[in-house]
């Protein structure tokens, strides 16, 4: 779900202030295991502010789908309908690929990008999961990704051959990005458009032009 892995919790919540687990959620409210009520202004607050937890209309649709059977050997018509809707919203794309997680979606995007670029090296900004291509940034220096959401990401098990194939730059630091592109044969730029910092000095326009 949208709450991420519990292994990330120590980096995001203060002990003894915010609970580890919930027993119930409704609207913007959550209850811990001791039935204490909280307003959720945390990770999932973006979702809860739009429709809220346990939205009656969504619950009704989910229950209906479960009763019809939500898994089969065949694909569901909803998959086709959603793909059709997405390509109508974004006519520049003629195909849709669904993924189960954000990390998987990023890995797919990187593979497609590398397949279509002569220069395979990547300049990256922000957090993009735990797949080898991303974590390889930390092979040379385990602190390279410390300013990109989660500190101390472990690279044990990541092939050492991936060293010096992906390079990190900080948001709004266009000069570093431009330098990387010149020195490291960068063919792909992977970044979050915005997280908690607004772009400055036409940063996004400069990146697109680059």
Residue ranges of model-derived segments:
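Short beta-strands and strand-loop turn motifs
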Residues: 40-43, 187-194
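Alpha-helix capping and helix-loop boundary segments enriched in small/acidic/polar residues
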Residues: 73-74, 100, 168, 195-198
